[in-house]
């Protein structure tokens, strides 16, 4: 596993960071979720992600929206990326606990940075008929999140 650094430099006095490495989720879906929660308060983002997991609220898909139907709310096409939301919620909880450890107040913090990078591809094969095999690759994602007390 390669060493991954944060893509922005943040002030360590009033920020907390968290990172998830090589998570087995879709890069496209996780990008859309991160774009939606960026700029939210940490408590709002946690509630939003829990609603997505419960399939009560859709995530608007702006870039990868082909085939996504119209959903209720201010969006054209949207989906319910449950597995990506679960992993991003884990990273958010980790960032909140890091803030609490540093003596910051997690309830008053905003997500100033939520980004993904594609991780390594885990190559695999699926056996097929007549002795053949088809490739079955698993994509991974690296998620980085930074919370700050000031916007």
Swiss-Prot record:
Here the segments flagged for biased composition (Polar residues) are 1-18
Which keywords annotate this record? Ribonucleoprotein, Ribosomal protein, RNA-binding, rRNA-binding
Region annotation (Disordered) maps to 1-23
Q: Which InterPro entries match?
A: Ribosomal_uL22, Ribosomal_uL22_euk/arc, Ribosomal_uL22_sf
Q: Name one GO molecular function term.
A: structural constituent of ribosome
Pull one GO CC term from this UniProt entry. cytosolic large ribosomal subunit
- Which GO biological process categories is it annotated with? cytoplasmic translation
Where does the source fall among the domains of life? Archaea
Q: What Pfam family is a match for this entry?
A: Ribosomal_L22
Quaternary structure annotation from Swiss-Prot or TrEMBL: Part of the 50S ribosomal subunit.
- Tell me which family the UniProt entry assigns to this protein: Belongs to the universal ribosomal protein uL22 family.
* PANTHER family assigned to the protein according to its UniProt record, in alphabetical order: 60S RIBOSOMAL PROTEIN L17
Cited function: This protein binds specifically to 23S rRNA. It makes multiple contacts with different domains of the 23S rRNA in the assembled 50S subunit and ribosome. The globular domain of the protein is located near the polypeptide exit tunnel on the outside of the subunit, while an extended beta-hairpin is found that lines the wall of the exit tunnel in the center of the 70S ribosome.
In Swiss-Prot or TrEMBL terms, this protein is called Large ribosomal subunit protein uL22
Which organism is the protein's source?
Methanosarcina mazei (strain ATCC BAA-159 / DSM 3647 / Goe1 / Go1 / JCM 11833 / OCM 88) (Methanosarcina frisia)
| Higher taxonomy | Archaea, Methanobacteriati, Methanobacteriota, Stenosarchaea group, Methanomicrobia
């Amino acid at each position: 596993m390669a060493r991954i650094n944060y893509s922005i430099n943040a002030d360590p006095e009033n920020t907390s960071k968290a990172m998830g490495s090589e998570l087995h989720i879709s890069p496209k879906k996780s990008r859309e979720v991160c774009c939606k929660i960026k700029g939210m308060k940490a408590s709002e983002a946690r509630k939003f992600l829990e609603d997505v997991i419960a399939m009560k609220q859709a995530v608007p898909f702006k870039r990868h929206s082909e085939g996504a139907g119209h959903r209720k709310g201010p969006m054209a096409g949207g989906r319910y990326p449950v597995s990506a939301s679960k992993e991003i919620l884990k990273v958010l909880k980790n960032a909140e606990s890091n803030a609490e450890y540093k003596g910051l107040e997690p309830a008053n913090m905003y997500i100033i940075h939520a980004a993904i990078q594609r991780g390594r591809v885990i190559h695999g094969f699926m056996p097929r008929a007549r002795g053949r095999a088809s490739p079955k690759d698993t994509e991974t994602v690296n998620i980085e999140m930074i919370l700050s007390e000031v916007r």
